[in-house]
Amino acid sequence: EVGPTVDIGTFSITLADPGQNRFLKAILKARVSASSVLEEVEGREPEIRDRVIDYLSSLTVKETQGAAAKSAIRGNLKKRINNILRTGELESIFLTEFVTQ
């Protein structure tokens, strides 16, 4: 059975490329293991957004390019968010929009 999905949010981030103003816009969704996790994710939105922003703003443009990079981003975000969840976990992260400029 497929678990419910939840919006993680829209993020506009300045990337960590020194001397360059490079930006990332990302819209994230997640599949959760149970509806109780859905409620926890919604209740912990500020903490989750903080972790996502911390991680994404540490990346360079190069670290956001290509399928392998996006897979690594999904895995790292899932791990960081799951570290604070108590009622279950995120099963998957979806990058529903992901644009660098």
Model-derived regions: residue spans:
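Flexible, low-complexity charged segments
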Residues: 1-101
